Structure formats: C-alpha cells, structure tokens
Amino acid sequence: MSACRSFAVAICILEISILTAQYTTSYDPELTESSGSASHIDCRMSPWSEWSQCDPCLRQMFRSRSIEVFGQFNGKRCTDAVGDRRQCVPTEPCEDAEDDCGNDFQCSTGRCIKMRLRCNGDNDCGDFSDEDDCESEPRPPCRDRVVEESELARTAGYGINILGMDPLSTPFDNEFYNGLCNRDRDGNTLTYYRRPWNVASLIYETKGEKNFRTEHYEEQIEAFKSIIQEKTSNFNAAISLKFTPTETNKAEQCCEETASSISLHGKGSFRFSYSKNETYQLFLSYSSKKEKMFLHVKGEIHLGRFVMRNRDVVLTTTFVDDIKALPTTYEKGEYFAFLETYGTHYSSSGSLGGLYELIYVLDKASMKRKGVELKDIKRCLGYHLDVSLAFSEISVGAEFNKDDCVKRGEGRAVNITSENLIDDVVSLIRGGTRKYAFELKEKLLRGTVIDVTDFVNWASSINDAPVLISQKLSPIYNLVPVKMKNAHLKKQNLERAIEDYINEFSVRKCHTCQNGGTVILMDGKCLCACPFKFEGIACEISKQKISEGLPALEFPNEK
C-alpha cells in the first residue's frame, strides 16, 4: 500500500497511567518445596473417554477428556489437548450431500458463483478457476476506473477468542467482490479503494483526541486488570487467559510467525518476544522488594469504521470445509480446535487502526534518591507533547528535545536515560508493519530508550497493517451456512462448545492463594498476585517477618 505515510491531520489519544506496584505476582520455576513454599501442583486431567463410533463420512473416531486441576506453585502446566482422533473404517455408508450449484457455475473449490462472474478478471472462485477457458478478453467490473485493494477492508470482520488468543484465520473471503465495483474514497489520501462484497459499509476516517489522562492504581492486580480489560470486560470473565492453542494440529506452525509472537534473538541467550504470554508474565514478574512504578503509555489511531453484511456473506473455502469436517455428534476436541482457529466470535462491525501501548518499568527508589520526578520521565520520553499526523509528514510538537532527558539541580546533573531509572519496557503494541516491529525490538535489545518518536514511526505504518481496535461481536456459530447439511446440529454444537470452552479453561480449577492473593490462570498455569505485605508463589511469605531478620527469598523472573 502506498498510503502509509499520507494521513490527514489527526489527533491521537495518549493515555498515561501510573501503575504503582502495591501488588506483585511472585512465581518462580526455580523455587522448591525445601524453601518453605507451597507444595507444587501438577496439571491433572481426567481419563480419556471411550472412542466414539466411526463417523462414516469423516472416517474418523474421537475421544476427549477434561482438565481437572491446572498446574500451580511451580507444578507442570496444562498444555496437552483435551481431544484426540484416529482413522477408522466405517461400517455404515456416508450420506454426505453432494454439492449442486444448479444453474450457477461450480468452482474447482466447490464454491457456487453466478455465471455472470465468469471471465471478468476477478478471482471469484478463490483459485481463478472461473477465469479458465475464456473465449474473449476479461471484462473487468471497474473497467478503466482506478481503484486499489484496501488493507482495512481485508481486515474487516476479523474475530477474537473469548480467552484472549488471536485467531489463526478469518472466516470471511474479503477478496470477493461479486462482480461489483463499489468504491470508497479515503479523504486522507484521496485514493479510491474497492469495497469487498462482505463489507456493507467502510468509512475512512483518521481521528482521535489530543488528550493526556493519568490514572493511579494502588494495587498491581488492578493495573493488570486494566491492561487486559478489553479482552475480558465484554464477557464478565474472571482472569482466565489462554494465548497458546492446544487443540489445533497446525497451531505450532501457524503461531510461530504471527504478528503477536515474532521473536528476535540478540547476543547470548537474551530473547525479546511480542508473545502475549511472555509479555503478561514479564509484567507480573516484577517484585516489589525494590519499589517499582509502572508508566503506562497508550495511544490509539482510528483509520476507519466498517459494518459487515448480515446475510449472503461469502466465506473462505477453508472455513466452509472446516465446518463440513466437524462431526455432527458433539466432540469437544474437534469443536475446540475450530474455535481456536477462527475465534469464538467475529466482528459484525467495528473500528480499524492501531494500538500503541508500552509499559515503562521505573525504579521508584532510584528516582527519589536522584531527585527525578514522574513528570521528568514523561518529558524525557516526549509523552507530554501533542502528536499530529499531517498529510505530508508525521511529527511531534516542536518542544520535543532530547536535552529534556538531563535534569539539573542542586549542583548535579542526572541523565534519565542512562541512570538506570527505566528498568525495562514491556510492549503491548498491536498493528503496524513487521518492519517496524523488528526495528522496535532491535532498539529494545540494545537497551535504547523508546520515546514518542517511535510512536510517530509506528503510526506511519499502520495503514499497511491495521488491526481491530474496537468491535461489536457476534458468535462464530452465526456464520454456519443455513443450506449446509446438518447446519442446525453444528450450530448447536458450536454454541455448546463456546460455553464448554470457557468452563474448561476456568480459574475455578486453580487452588486459592494465601493471605488474600488473587489467582490468575494463564496458558494452563495458575499464578498468585500477592498483596503488598506478602510474597511467594502462594503469597505465603510475610515481608514483615523478612524485615525482622528472617532470610529473604529471591524470585528471579521466569524466562
């Protein structure tokens, strides 16, 4: 796309939250029972069920099991599948419905399209089989009108997983145009984009507010809740998070290169990753034995709004085939695998753009000792300034000056970026190109401070790689084609599967933490977020006793 550097005047929201570390999560795989901690609990699963009957059309049989207790207190986490399958020889004939397109054209993929869509230059079948054996030159629907394909339109309708995981694929074929040339004009770039059939409306608008907001959290668990709020508030879920697929066969291959988990290795064994699992665990791992402060910087850019068509949508061939491959009897593992591939819900409408979110881990004790205040940190990083995205260039306010990182007073000068006042930076960025992601990671690997200019660089790339930043959700089972054989049964099974999925990976299967600690379930392992006066993997250790002379325990960060 050529529009990544061409924005109209836009105003971004920068939210700055001060997350004071009055809560700390203390979990450590190195800690043993000999140190006086709680006894470790390994993942425990129920026995396998009996094998199902052989499905005559799928030629497979299935079995399942349940998670009884999640790993906790340095025990083994639950990472194994709850479903299993194997090939079989059916004893009954398959009564599978044959694809019949009637008077329409049947693609090699099995899709049925209108005959008028043949030989028009568009890939209406998804494999260009509708463009084979044409007797004359294609008749493009847009003729000589100049249009471009839109990344915003491709992203429209993308789903979410109720437990926070990024779906591996989208159900919508947003490169199908149904022979139409519906064009939408981006007022920022003056470019016309062709709107796919599935998208009922797409409005390009780069907007926001020039606004700074500061929030203060007395407990770190409340700060953590604020970070994951958008992933749980819509469903009133407890703190149960699952970022790694366990049921999908191709999960390992699919997930290694997703935008949310690209890795970059530096010298030695240090590894930086955008994996949500690692990111959240990194945030939770900071101990409050050294008083910490968390500077939460958040900026959103909205590029456009969309509404999906509510009927006659065109789904990808893969999505339709995967629905057909679901057994008509309810098999938990198979339906969970489907949910982990496509999400539990899809977006019927929403906003597209990017979310720039960083958490700076600040050493509060060092700041006090060296006379550095929070406003000095913000001024050094440039987050006290307004940011403008202009048509020809992207810039920050003229006041941004690297000299602001040196604070002078009482006969001394403190360089904020080199005095170990900023311990770490945790990235929760969504959207933007892979090129920018690698550039940012390289800076973090080198220990270079990330400031407002990095926000500007990121903003220039989100048109090429937008993400959903707000959405109205609909259950994925609403997309089951009504004319498909056994559609009603499979829709019922998917509805049941979503409920079972939430209950299967529930924090209720964790043991309680001691002394008022809060339990967090993350990727098959239960963690304890401890009140300020306690620490340990179960919040079992009183810091008051440590201060009275008992040996202190160390809690190195989990890698």
Swiss-Prot record:
| Entry-listed glycosylation sites | W48, W51, N277, N415
Against CDD domains, the record matches this protein to: LDLa
* Outcome of substituting V89E: Reduced inhibition by the antibody aE11
Query: What, per the annotation, is the impact of changing F283C?
Result: Creates an artifactual disulfide bond that prevents the conformation change required for oligomerization and pore formation
A cellular component term, taken from the record's GO annotations: plasma membrane
Query: Residues in domain LDL-receptor class A?
Result: 99-136
Keyword Signal on this protein? yes
Q: How does it assemble?
A: Homooligomer; about 20 C9 chains oligomerize to give rise to a huge beta-barrel that forms a 100 Angstrom diameter pore in target membranes. Component of the membrane attack complex (MAC), composed of complement C5b, C6, C7, C8A, C8B, C8G and multiple copies of the pore-forming subunit C9.
According to the UniProt entry, which disease involves this protein?
Answer: Complement component 9 deficiency: A rare defect of the complement classical pathway associated with susceptibility to severe recurrent infections predominantly by Neisseria gonorrhoeae or Neisseria meningitidis. Some patients may develop dermatomyositis. Macular degeneration, age-related, 15: A form of age-related macular degeneration, a multifactorial eye disease and the most common cause of irreversible vision loss in the developed world. In most patients, the disease is manifest as ophthalmoscopically visible yellowish accumulations of protein and lipid that lie beneath the retinal pigment epithelium and within an elastin-containing structure known as Bruch membrane.
Q: What is this protein called?
A: Complement component C9
Give the originating organism: Homo sapiens (Human)
The gene is: C9
